[in-house]
């Protein structure tokens, strides 16, 4: 059964809306085909909004946790450390649903949360975090990329 078939045709109350959002975000974690797998995460840098698409790695409705991974060398770490306010938004035109969440972001480095995230990461993801110079560095020649061994990624929570 497709996700669209599991959702109501008409939302009559907030409980139905929340249940649908829970279902959509729960399915977005493992399903790379849904647009909610890669929502836009916005933070603040020097009084300006900075937005980027990030991969949703965990959704826990009861604890109000969304987990995303990022390289601890990325500029967003400094942004989040200085101002934890954040917004996450996703939209799927086929479902005709937008989900917007606001909250505060926590950065986890070298702690149990980060270790768990690293251990659950795929070899491909780990390779992305081991590019010398950081994952946001422009690469002129992909064949000339060298890697270093990193033990843990940063794991921001929204």
Regions flagged by a language model, labelled:
Residues 149-158:
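Single conserved hydrophobic/aromatic residue that forms the stacking wall/gate
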Residues 1-150:
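Binding-site signature for planar aromatic cofactors or substrates
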């Amino acid at each position: 059964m497709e996700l669209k078939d599991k959702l109501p045709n008409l939302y009559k109350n907030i409980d139905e809306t929340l249940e649908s959002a829970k279902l959509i975000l729960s399915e977005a974690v493992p399903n790379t085909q849904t647009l909610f797998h890669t929502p836009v995460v916005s933070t603040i840098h020097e009084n300006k909004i900075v937005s980027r698409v990030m991969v949703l790695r965990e959704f826990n409705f009861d604890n109000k946790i969304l987990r995303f991974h990022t390289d601890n060398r990325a500029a967003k770490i400094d942004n989040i450390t200085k101002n934890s306010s954040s917004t996450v938004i996703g939209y799927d035109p086929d479902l005709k649903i937008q989900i917007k969440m606001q909250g505060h972001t926590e950065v986890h480095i070298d702690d149990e949360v980060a270790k768990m995230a690293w251990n659950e990461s795929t070899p491909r993801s780990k390779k992305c975090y081991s590019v010398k110079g950081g994952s946001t560095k422009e690469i002129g020649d992909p064949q000339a990329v060298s890697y270093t061994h990193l033990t843990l990624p940063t794991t921001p929570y929204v």
